[in-house]
Each structure stands twice: as structure tokens, then as C-alpha cells.
Amino acid sequence: MAEAEGESLESWLNKATNPSNRQEDWEYIIGFCDQINKELEGPQIAVRLLAHKIQSPQEWEAVQALTVLEACMKNCGRRLHNEVGKFRFLNELIKVVSPKYLGDRVSEKVKAKVIELLFSWTLALPEEAKIKDAYHMLKRQGIVQSDPPIPMDRTLIPSPPPRPKNPVFDDEEKSKLLAKLLRSKNPDDLQEANQLIKSMVKEDEARIQKVTKRLHTLEEVNNNVKLLHEMLLHYSQEFSSEADKELMKELFDRCENKRRTLFKLASETEDNDNSLGDILQASDNLSRVINSYKTIIEGQIINGEVTTSTVPDSEGNSHCGNQGALIDLAELDTPSSSSPVLAPAPAPPTSGIPILPPPPQTSGPPRSRSSSQAEAPSGPDSTNNALSLLDEELLCLGLSDPAPTAPKESAGNSPWHLFQNEPSSDLDFFSPRLVSAASCPSEGSLLPPPVSTSSLSQAPLPAAFPAPVVPASAVTHSTGSFTFSSGPAPALVPKAEPEGPEYPSSSISHRLDALDQLLEEAKVTSGLVKPVSCFSPGPTASPLLPASTPARPLLPFSTGPGSPLFQSPAFQSQGSPQKGPELSLASVHVPLESIKPSSALPVTAYDKNGFRILFHFAKECPPGRPDVLVVVVSMLNTAPLPVKSIVLQAAVPKSMKVKLQPPSGTELSPFSPIQPPAAITQVMLLANPMKEKVRLRYKLTFALGEQLSTELGEVDQFPPVEQWGNL
């Protein structure tokens, strides 16, 4: 066999399909399959090479190419299945059997083999719908008269799904202990093993009961939400009967009661549990339909326009139709370069409770996220703030983390320039944070009328139950224009010094974390938090108080025995772990041209529909920061459609920090077979001073052609922490 070193896919295929071969050479066929699995773009290159060989005028070469294709489908996995399942490759196969193209010049043996492969794939790969469409089209055109027989030895058997793991019986420590006890000849050990088995069975029964209860709760919530949503769609104040109104009130009460149940379920669910997404989606739908009921039936304007309506719900959400609190992930939503940068004004001395921004508000009726962009006018304040209620749930549960952006080296009016010198890299991960803006039409506002700013853009998640559109007459519009930002959080109480503005110290951040937890407790117990004033934090430090405004509390709390203000300081301190200066990445910036690649293999973070994201690891750490891993994020497009509006956000646990530097672009051109794939690069910095195992979550938003997509994922295949700086 030829040496594998230096062999390319083309050389492997040329040897495997050589017309001079007397028989199929499986040595080279398997070598070709292995090379596909090794190469980053192996499947994309392989299908192009195979399509050319299959259309060869030499029958023996074409038959060998089809044998290679069949072997690849069995050995190269889903990546190759996705490429073969695209019309680009299927059209090449159809040309072989269609009399309009090559059908009259291709032998019957080759055509029969192609039809046989297509039919076997329709049975073995039902998820590849395009293969089935192509085969049925051939049948409709009469090219395929009947389904060919498929020998058992040539049937494509997909890889079986992984065996579902039982967390109780797959516990490594218990399994080792049980095996040790069972091997023992001591009767006491056998008795202990018997007790251990019984306890494991009980744990498994409790787990099954918990899962059953969760499924029942989710089903009940979804049924109530669906029924209430449909009744609200057909509600008319003049023509709806009292019975309908009573039924809607009963459904509304049920939905309110289920909020806390869902919040409890989410808090009890592990981060890596697949059911967490279903719980959050159900909570998202529940919050949306509750807000719709309050708006349509009770006439409330949600989130800030009527002060009695701005109390956050029991889950800590502040919903607002097509606007909401951004998920506290990588802060990559860039403000318009025309946004003014306001200098902090002198503020009165701070009190024991730091000032927190109230929930955001909307200047129009609540609407579903799926329709907000289509219905809203093109102005920046109405289209760019279509944010996700699911993001709010992630934010409140502490499952999402911020990753601040780095300043660009070039100055000017670039949107990234506004992120320079921000203190947000010291903010806490996984702690509930209200990164939002709001306004109040009342005279007690702490800010003068805000200057008109350009809002930030965030791709919305589709709404499962879009909220009904409320007539404009039922809405009292706000007078201000506000900006939401997933960018750096502003200084809450800036101090006045001769040298210039100064951002709050870490102790204030700790008190913020403690108050965040108090707010969460207050929302769950009795909904005591009622903002009486509103202000708008922007992406840069903005004045929160005019110089002449006296200090006064923003958040009145009830003083009953259950009030969170009576909780012990020890409880309050649990809001956030102590953060040291070594976590900060604000001053760390790594130019792309200075990065040296390492020998570590890249990790595929996302690969779907021809859009792929890879993590490449740098050889060295930034100077003076051996705890920081430098990752180059490569985004590739092999799809025939352009990919636009690409935004990548990242999150890590509290003991780490992550920062995404500005990407080289936000659009990828369509794939062309005569040109290399379009690519975007973005540098990501990951600080891990505690040397813990890295678990990074990401949120990816993009538009493939005209279709908007939002993807969530997790990556944990990082190099060992001990090898950072010497990869």
C-alpha cells in the first residue's frame, strides 16, 4: 500500500478507480474513506471528485466510482450524508440516468447501480428528504419503473443511536463499588451490595417519576397557553360572552400559577439536560400569553408605560412583546456610530443599596417576535430591538454568560470603537443581570429626555405562539426612544473626580450581585419590586442622575417579615463569587496576524446546511497571561446561498471569562466550486485562572439566504489547561 503521508483525496480516488484495475481495490477505497474523515473539507471535496468519476465514459471507471461512493456512505458518517443529500450532487447522479443528459451514452449497468443506490438511501436515510425527492421525481418521469431489489449485504445500515444512559446505573463510583462488593466472598459485603442495588433502583424510580411529572406539567402548560391564545385571537369586547371571559380568566389564573412551577422545574434541571430547552420554551410561551391577556383584556401596557404593569414576574422576566432583556452572552451587538457618548455627571453619595435599572419598556403594543420585523416600520427603534423572551429565561436562570468585545486598533467612527475602555469584562457570569433600558412618562424620571439613538440589532427566535396584535387605540405610547445593549454594562453610580469619570469598584459589583439575588427572591415570593423611575443605560457610561437630582431610593420594598431586605448578609453575599482582577480581559487584545497556530486539531463547533464554525487553538498565550487561551474562530460557507448578519456570542462558567474580538466580517458569499470557500475569522480569548475544565456555550444568529436562524450549542473539547501556552 502506498504511504498515507502526502496522499490527497484525488490521488486516493484515482488509484481506487483506475480503469486498469482488474478488480475493485479495497485498499485504496478504504484509504479514500479515511482521508475524507481526516480532512476538514473532506466531504465537500469528495463529492465533487466522485461526481466527475461517476460520469466517466468508461464503464469500469464509473462502476468503481459508484462502489467508492457506496463505501463512503457506510464509513464517513453524517458529514458526507449531508453533502450527498444536496441537490448539487444529486443533480449529477440524475444526469447519469436521464436521457436528456447522459442517459443515452451511459451503460445500463451504471444506470442500474445509480438507481439502486438512490433507492437504498431513501430507506436508510429518511432525514435526507432531498434524496427521496430526487428518487420520486425519477419515478414520476418514468425513468424508474419499479423499485430495484436491494441485497442485504449492500443495504446501508445507519449508525445506531447511542444507548440512552441511565444516570443512576452509569454512576462510575457506584458501579465500581458494586463490582467490588459482588466480587467479595464476605457475606457482609454481599448484603451491602444488595442494599446498594435497592438504593440505586429507588433513585431510578424517583428519577422516572420526576421526568413523568415534568412532562405532565409541560403538557398542561402548553394546552392552557394554546387555548388562551386562541381565545384571545377571537376576543371582542362587544361580542364576547361572559362565559368566554370567565373561561379566559380561569385560564389566565392557571397560567399565572404555572409560572412558579416552571421556574422551579428549570432551577432543578441540570444545565446539560435536554429538557431544559423545552422548559424554557414553555415558560417563554406562558409569559407571552400572560402579557397578551393583560394587554387585551385588562388594558395594561406591559413593561414601564403603566407603572402598575412593570412588576417583574415570578420568574424574573420583564417581557415586552418584541423587546426584552438581552441574554448576557458575548457583547457583540454594535451600536450605531452616531450614538452620542455621554460623560458621567457627578452623583450624590451612594446608599447601601445600589441603583438598578428597571425593566425595559416598549413604545408600542406587545407583539410576537416572529412577526415584529415584518410588521414594524423600518426605523431603528422599531426593528432592531426584536429580542427573545427565551433569552430572558436563560438570563434569569444564570445559564448564559457575557463575553465582552475587544476594542479595535483603528480609531474613528467604527461601531467597535465605542466598546473601548469598558469595565464590563469584570462583570459576573451566570448571575442575573438586567442589561436593559426603560423610560417612564412620569415627572419623576431621573434622566432628561434621552437623545435619539440607534438601537442594537439582535436576531429574534421564532415565537411558537405569537401574541395577538392589539389595536392602537388601546396603547398609550411612550415619549422616549431607548437603546438595548448586550454590550458592556454602564457604570451605575459614577464618581466625579478632576481627572475624569471613574467606573464603580468591584465591591459595587458584588453588592449588585447580592441585590440581584434579593430581587430574584422578591419576584418569586410576592412581586414586591416596583420601579418608580426609569433610566437608559447605553453601551457607554451614561449619567444616571443629573447633578441637581437628590439621592432617593429607586426600588421600594415591602417591609414585611418575608421581605428579602431582612435576609442575612451571609445570604446576600451568595449572589456572586469573589472576582479577582486576574479574570479581567479588558486590556487584553491579540492581533490576528501575531497568532501562531498550534499542532492541536481544530474543533467543529457548528456544522449544518453548509455553514461551519471551527475553533483553532493558538500555540502561545498572550504576554503576561498564561491563564488565557487564544482561539481563532473560523466561519466557512459551502452552501449555494449567502450567509449574512452573522453574530456569534459565547458564555462560560463564573470562574472563567471569555471575550470575542471584532470579527473580520459578518457576511459570507455563496460557495463556488472554482473558488475557495468564503471565510470569516474572529479571535476569542478565554481566561481560566482556576484551571478548571472548560465548558463554553455559544449562541449563533445568521441569515442563510432569506431564512433567519438562531442556534445554541456547547463546546467542551478544549486542550488540557496544563498545556496552554505550549500547544
Curated annotation (Swiss-Prot):
Q: How is it modified after translation?
A: Phosphorylated by CK2 and dephosphorylated by PP2A. Phosphorylation of GGA3 allows the internal DXXLL motif to bind the VHS domain and to inhibit the recognition of cargo signals.
Q: Where is this region: Disordered?
A: 334-385, 400-419
Post-translational modification Phosphoserine, affected residues: 159, 275
List, for all copies, the residue spans of the domain called VHS. Answer: 16-146
List the PROSITE patterns hit by this protein, alphabetically. GAE, GAT, VHS
Quaternary structure, per UniProt, is: Monomer. Interacts with GGA1 and GGA2. Binds to clathrin and activated ARFs, such as ARF1, ARF5 and ARF6. Binds RABEP1 and RABGEF1. Interacts with the membrane proteins M6PR/CD-MPR and IGF2R/CI-MPR and the accessory proteins SYNRG, EPN4, NECAP1, NECAP2 and AFTPH/aftiphilin. Interacts with TSG101 and UBC. Interacts with ADRA2B. Interacts with NTRK1; the interaction is independent of NTRK1 activation and ubiquitination. Interacts (via VHS domain) with BACE1 (via DXXLL motif).
User: Which family is this protein grouped under?
Assistant: Belongs to the GGA protein family.
Q: What is this protein called?
A: ADP-ribosylation factor-binding protein GGA3
Q: Which organism is it from?
A: Rattus norvegicus
